[in-house]
């Protein structure tokens, strides 16, 4: 009887202990899930400042400001704070070292790069056992092969995803593509196969692509990112892989300008990032600068060619301040010609380019400089370079010129090769606004932008590294639309800026602008027009 009672009491104690254990596991898992949602999951909202818990953890508003560091165990003593650490994990011991370090150092997250499957499950179980001690972001990364692709050094996707989902699911995935040659880009079949693997995931996924191939791979990568707002991009490099070691600032900018900025992270050496951050200021997207996704919401002011109007403009709400630049002859033979803000036929002004840039550069407004002659380009760009190097330009800068002959006129533009060469040699970190000379004939016999016109323009623009916008005359847009669509499709770095003369004497219909609005991407067409012609 006593033995039976002991067995019963033992069973009760065991059941109680097991219940407590399971309750502890449940609470720990719940807490982990909450922390995972807080630290790891990335959701796109309307307000940029709350898009990413990664950004929230580091108290940042923009991934461009996040610091990454590739490190080995020998770097443990020198790894700094406020950064994501990308570390290769080859054993449970290595994982323990980095987890311990992340707990000690303020504001450090871990990106765990697994190079083989043998340690993955062991490390995931170890993460699960220590989940209550994890108070920092953890990303689990593997370079994966899909559909039995034979990619040297890659993990098999099916096994990689299965191990994580069944062992430690409350984590952020990161999957990478390993280029094995300079032409080994991310192709459409790869991203479609990857999407089949990840489309039912509850957690966010980072796609990691080498900087050296990101521009050539951009269309399929962008397609994948558009499938879900829970998919994010990390552009990276690898010093150990020759084909992944090149970093172009303008390739990074090309991608950044074509997405909401919160969706692109940069695991790039700080030396490259410093140059990139500077380029992203003057050659960055005005939409990023103002926190918009709709180019029609950008507002403009024109012909700011004297000090009085300049001061009025600074007090106004216009986002873009535009002015024409001329080089004026000196009053005496000893003086050097200087660029001023003036629109022909006026050739005098109390506002020169240097003062204009110094005052407008940090005003919170974007700048557009319109050049009517080649002589004023070089001295103006040297001023831009000088002032920008001192931090005096903190907003996007557009450089505009008509470089080709366009509809309804025989007037020639500036020499395209000379104009572009000066920009690329003096200060290339700008958006190029490349247009055609045009006229509007009151007789009504107006033609639009022909296919040869846009093809010639594309031959110039497609060779450029910078973002390019094409200013097109509003009265000619509707009849040219098919050709302009063709032009836009040649590069994701292209946009249109629809303009009309000031004061407007062209026959421009709101209906035509609404047509353009309804048949284009909101981020790809700017409307530099009177308010009554802005489409909704």
Task: Please give the residue ranges for each predicted region.
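Phosphate-group recognition and catalysis centered on beta-loop-alpha active-site segments
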Residues: 2-536
């Amino acid at each position: 009887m006593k033995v039976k009672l002991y067995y019963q009491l033992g069973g009760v104690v065991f059941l109680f202990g097991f219940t407590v254990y399971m309750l502890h596991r449940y609470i720990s898992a719940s807490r982990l899930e909450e922390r995972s949602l807080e630290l790891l999951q990335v959701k796109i909202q309307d307000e940029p400042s709350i898009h990413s818990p990664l950004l929230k953890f580091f108290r940042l508003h923009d991934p461009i400001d996040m610091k990454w560091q590739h490190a080995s165990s020998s770097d443990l003593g020198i790894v700094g704070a406020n950064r994501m650490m990308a570390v290769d994990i080859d054993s449970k011991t290595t994982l323990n070292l980095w987890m311990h370090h992340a707990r000690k150092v303020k504001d450090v997250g871990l990106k765990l790069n697994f190079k083989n499957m043998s340690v993955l499950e062991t490390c995931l179980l170890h993460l699960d056992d220590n989940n209550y001690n994890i108070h920092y972001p953890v990303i689990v990364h593997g370079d994966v092969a899909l559909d039995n692709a034979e990619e040297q050094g890659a993990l098999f996707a099916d096994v990689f995803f299965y191990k994580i989902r069944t062992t430690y699911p409350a984590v952020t995935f990161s999957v990478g593509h390993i280029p094995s040659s300079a032409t080994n880009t991310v192709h459409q079949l790869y991203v479609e196969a990857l999407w089949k693997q990840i489309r039912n995931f509850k957690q966010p996924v980072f796609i990691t692509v080498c900087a050296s191939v990101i521009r050539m791979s951009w269309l399929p990568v962008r397609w994948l990112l558009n499938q879900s707002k829970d998919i994010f991009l990390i552009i990276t490099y690898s010093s150990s892989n020759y084909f992944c070691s090149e970093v172009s600032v303008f390739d990074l900018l090309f991608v950044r300008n074509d997405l909401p900025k919160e969706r692109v992270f940069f695991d790039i050496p700080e030396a490259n990032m410093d140059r990139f951050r500077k380029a992203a200021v003057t050659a960055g997207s005005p939409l990023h600068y103002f926190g918009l996704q709709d180019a029609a919401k950008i507002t403009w002011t024109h012909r700011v060619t004297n000090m009085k109007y300049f001061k009025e403009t600074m007090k106004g709400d216009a986002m873009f301040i535009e002015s024409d630049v001329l080089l004026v002859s000196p009053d005496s033979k000893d003086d050097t010609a200087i660029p001023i803000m003036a629109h022909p036929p006026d050739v005098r002004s109390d506002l020169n380019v240097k003062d204009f840039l110094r005052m407008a550069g940090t005003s919170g407004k974007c700048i557009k400089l319109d050049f009517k002659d080649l002589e004023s380009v070089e001295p103006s760009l040297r001023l831009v370079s000088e002032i920008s190097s001192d931090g005096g330009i903190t907003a996007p800068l557009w450089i505009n010129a008509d470089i080709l002959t366009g509809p309804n006129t025989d007037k020639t533009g500036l020499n395209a090769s000379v104009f572009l060469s000066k920009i690329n040699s003096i200060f290339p970190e700008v958006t190029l606004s490349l247009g055609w000379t045009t006229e509007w004939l009151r007789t009504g016999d107006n033609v639009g932008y022909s296919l040869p016109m846009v093809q010639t323009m594309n031959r110039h623009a497609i060779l450029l590294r910078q973002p390019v916008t094409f200013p097109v005359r509003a009265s000619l847009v509707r009849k040219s639309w098919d050709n302009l669509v063709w032009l836009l499709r040649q590069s994701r770095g292209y946009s249109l800026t629809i303009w009309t003369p000031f004061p407007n004497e062209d026959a421009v219909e709101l209906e035509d602008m609404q047509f353009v609005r309804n048949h284009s991407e909101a981020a790809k067409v700017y409307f530099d027009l009177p308010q009554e012609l802005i489409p909704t």
